[in-house]
Amino acid sequence: NTQAFMDYGKVSRRWMMPAKYYTKVFDHKGTAIRVIFLDTTPLIDSYRKNQEIYPDACKQDAEAQLSWLDETLKNAKEDWVIVVGHHPIYAYTTKKENERLDMQKRLLPILHKYNNVAIYACGHIHNFQHIQKKGDNIDYVVNSSSSLARPVKPIDGTVFCSPADGFSVFTADKKQLRM
């Protein structure tokens, strides 16, 4: 229930999820980073078609979110732009390939359109992966979790992969975005 997560922000100062998709700019010592948070579930066809398991995805207008993303990226002037979604665009996984193909079909044209996205970060498959596709300026980062770790192996473009649990830390200045 996505609405429950948004409502929880009204009772806890430590939780902030103002909408199903939103953006936030972090500015520190003159370096600005725009983080764009997406709800990727409605971007996957099989989720939108399964009202019993994914009722939130069935009710959402995926095209409205994609239009919002396009407009947000068009106007993004920060030093760095990171897009965050739950589902991977590229990754080694035993999960259904159609999920990644749907993400590639819907997100990649927009992410590449303004040439300003540095990283697409996600989770969903419970391991670490850093993928750089040849000819693509975006780094694709899959984050693990602390509750479950799944096996992983390199795919085309893999820079790093590990089944360890944990999280990623990013630091930035005007010249470099480091992970």
Residue ranges of model-derived segments:
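Histidine-centered catalytic micro-motifs
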Residues: 84-90, 120-128
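Short acidic, glycine-rich surface-loop motifs adjacent to enzyme active sites
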Residues: 76-94
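Extended active-site neighborhood of metal-dependent phosphoesterases/phosphodiesterases
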Residues: 1-77, 97-98, 102, 106-119, ...
